Amino acid sequence: MANMTPRKNSVTRLIAPVALALTLAACSSSPKAPDRLDITQSPTETSNAYILKADQQQGALEADFLIMALKAAVQEQNFDLADKLFTRLATMQLSPAQTAEMQLAHAKMLKSQSQYEDALKTLNFEAWWKLENSQWVEYHKLRHELYLLSGDNLNSARELIELEPFTAEDQKAQLWTQVWTSVSSLNSTALEEVKLDETETNLHGWVQLATYLDTLKHSPMRLQETLNEWLLANPTHPAATYTPQVILDILALEIVRPENVALLLPLSGRFGPQGIRVRDGFINAMMEDKERDEFTKLKVIDTQATSMAEIMTTLEKEQIQFVVGPLVRSKIEEFQSLNSTEIAQLALNIPSEIDTDINSCYFTLSPEQEAEQAAVHLFKQGFKHPLYLAPQGTMGERLSQAFSDKWFQLTAKRPSISYFGSKAQLQQKVNSVFGIESSQARIYQMNALASMELEAQPRSRRDIDAVYMVAKSSELVLLKPFIEVAINPGIKPPKLYASSRSNSGRQTQLVEIKGIEFSDIPLLTNENHSFKAQYDELWPKSSNGETRLHALGMDAYQLVAELPQMKAVDNYRMEGKTGELSLNQECVIQRKMSWAVHGEETE
């Protein structure tokens, strides 16, 4: 028995270090898994790697690894796997932080698939959730982006405002600029329909400023006063500290609305009828102006019956502050050469050379601008090979050059250009342009070589996908069927477009030219234009040409008040009767026209 004890003790001493060694070996080969993961970070491993780790865990840690796998799958654009992970996570008990990350990942996946509305429905954080600041920031940023992509600028601004508590001071100027960009992009109708909660004082202020700019844009002095008053009354609003540049520009304007205005137009002679129409439009707008100072004086002078020297004497005697006109190019040049006191001028034509050092701007119904806009319109419609068809002569060449230059600017390629002469030559010209004549000549040549008549049909060009025609309605009536006949069966016909020259207003020709899209002033493309009924009642027998001149006169009056803003505010736009007006570097008014389709009712 005595000999048994030492043996037992030695075995015990031997087993202890072996067990310890095995334990240490086990610890070194299988490191302890972390209690939690930082699931707010971007994934650093593949989705499959995270799934393998998740399968070895349970509870919250398993969910963490699955969420990281989900984020990795979305990053890899493996959406089938992402859907399976969503299904698996949906059966688990998730914390608010985990639910938030799952929503963010799901929304990002839907965003990448252009499912913006579904993505927004997915993002629905609860206000009571205790989350990391980074999660709230990502939530509001993502919702902002989704609202923008959905065209909902008001709600995009709401999300930006929610980011304010998380934004560093040196980044707040950028944040409020983004808010203003979203709110100020709302059109008149959208601003009128805005409904805000009483607690949304911040957003209410931005909407108020945008509304002032929209509703008072034609009354610069009132707008300036209103903006000043608002900023003084709301010193704690972000707009008072981070004032939008457009508002600063308006506040800096030295607005002096001229009280003595002269209208220089030909009221007799060759250009008398045009001058009278412009005059009527100008006075019409003046009478409609509720903001007009009762002391404003208008002096109308006939440039055909009065010498320019006499006119200058009258202007000085009457203390004229602003001149609208003349209408004729030579008279404009003569006025500018004698305008030693530099009276501000809005000329109603464009001289051959523009002197940017004098106090003059220019506004006219420019056919060259219309040609340039036609090029832009066709380009935006996706056409690649347009044909520009214009009448022979100086005008046709001038307009085709304007179209060609703009098309080259947009595409680095020149369009096809062709000119037509008399109506009797129209069909021959169309056949020539579309290659029918050359194709017919090749058929004759083949018949001669074969000494027999072969069965063959002339083939038309296939590359022309759009035709823009500078033509009267009477010419368009012939051009349309000639083009349709020239195109071989089975070939997609080119889309037909026309200038305002085609819009004569003659109802009898609408059937023949139905379907052709044309450009013109809004007053003639939109039957429901707010001023159309009133105009038709006052001038019921007006031709479309006379209506355009009347609209020119009305817009000229409005420009007298708005030119200071147009000069000071970048990208300023004015909705006029002749189109959307803006100003270029040479102080020439640029006119964006409207489009309509012959024979179709407008909205």
Curated annotation (Swiss-Prot):
Positions where lipid (S-diacylglycerol cysteine) attaches: 27
Locate the lipid attachment (N-palmitoyl cysteine). Answer: 27
Tell me if Membrane is a UniProt keyword of this record.
yes
GO CC, one annotated term: periplasmic side of cell outer membrane
Keyword set, alphabetical order: Cell outer membrane, Cell shape, Lipoprotein, Membrane, Palmitate, Peptidoglycan synthesis, Signal
Q: Which CDD domains match?
A: PBP1_YraM_LppC_lipoprotein-like
Instruction: Read off the SUPFAM superfamilies from this record.
Output: Periplasmic binding protein-like I
Q: Does the keyword Cytoplasm apply?
A: no
**Signal sequence annotation:** 1-26
Write out the GO biological process terms.
peptidoglycan biosynthetic process; regulation of cell shape
Topology of the protein relative to the lipid bilayer: Lipid-anchor
Q: Where in the cell is it found?
A: Cell outer membrane
Which molecular function term from Gene Ontology is one that the record holds?
enzyme regulator activity
Instruction: State the source organism's domain of life.
Output: Bacteria
Gene3D superfamilies this protein is in?
1.25.40.650, 3.40.50.2300, Tetratricopeptide repeat domain (1.25.40.10)
| Biological role stated in the UniProt entry | Regulator of peptidoglycan synthesis that is essential for the function of penicillin-binding protein 1A (PBP1a).
- Could you describe the subunit structure of this protein? Interacts with PBP1a.
Q: Which family does it belong to?
A: Belongs to the LpoA family.
Q: What is this protein called?
A: Penicillin-binding protein activator LpoA
Q: Tell me the classification of the organism that encodes this protein.
A: Bacteria, Pseudomonadati, Pseudomonadota, Gammaproteobacteria, Vibrionales
